Every structure is written in C-alpha cells, then in structure tokens.
C-alpha cells in the first residue's frame, strides 16, 4: 500500500509539472514582422488583409505585429500613390495595436517629406520611423519575431 501511495504521489507531482510546463507559454504574445518593400498595390492590399486576418485569428491581445516599410513600400503611406482603401486599412490596423517601422534611409534618399507620409488622416509619428528598414527587420528577427513577406 505504501508503494502505491508513493507511486501515486510521484505521478501527481509529475502531472502537475507537465501541466505547469505546458501552461508556461500561455499569455506570451506571438511576435510577427510583416515586410513591405514593393509599390504593388495588390501586394499592399493582400498584406494588410493578411495582418487583419492574423489579428482576427489569434486576438489582438495575443499578437505583437510590426509592419516594416522601406524602399518602394513607402508608397503605402503616400496619397496619390496608394489606394484609399489601403490608407483606411493601415489606420484601422494601427488602432488595433499594429506598429509601423518606416525606413528613414528611404525617406532621406528619396527626399520625402515626412509630413506627406500618413496613416489614414494622421501623419506618421517620429516613433513610426526606424533608422533603416532592413536593419530593423534583422533586429526584430534576432529578437524572435516571425518574418512574413506578403
């Protein structure tokens, strides 16, 4: 009988450890970076819809998404160079917690006016600008962000 109780207690402890270990990852946000470096409006639209689908699937509280834009990808933020629906999609995604990483190298090299880059009706903020889009992608991947290229 004593052996039975010892084995039962050991199994109880083992199952609790397994349960604790399985639940350790709960509450941890999935980290994802979406990469935009094309001026193709269809790619912009598809990528922005992918981000919304991602949020819908896992819940905005369970995911941290950063959209990094560089090179021709900055056309997403320029009136007259992108579809109006994409402006609205980006604004809606920002309201859900999606962050932007807008490449300062591109802004500088293309002599863009930061005040002409916008998200919906709002201008981009200094906090949306990163020194280099490609450097930001590498940094985020080294921090465990999953990489998605629409």
Go through the PLM ranges and name each one:
Residues 1-24:
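N-terminal export/membrane-targeting signals
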Residues 21-150:
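Secreted/extracellular ectodomain signature
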């Amino acid at each position: 009988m004593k052996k039975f109780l010892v084995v039962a207690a050991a199994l109880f402890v083992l199952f609790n450890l397994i349960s604790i270990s399985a639940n350790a990852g709960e509450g941890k946000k999935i980290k994802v970076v979406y990469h935009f470096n094309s001026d193709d409006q269809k790619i912009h639209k598809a990528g922005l819809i992918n981000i919304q689908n991602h949020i819908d699937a896992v819940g905005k509280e369970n995911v941290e998404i950063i959209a990094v834009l560089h090179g021709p990808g900055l056309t997403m933020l320029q009136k007259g160079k992108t579809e109006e629906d994409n402006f609205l999609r980006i604004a809606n995604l920002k309201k859900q917690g999606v962050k932007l990483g807008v490449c300062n190298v591109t802004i500088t090299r293309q002599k863009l006016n930061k005040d002409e880059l916008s998200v919906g009706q709002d201008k981009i903020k200094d906090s949306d600008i990163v020194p280099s889009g490609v450097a930001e992608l590498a940094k985020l991947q080294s921090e465990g962000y999953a990489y998605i290229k629409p």
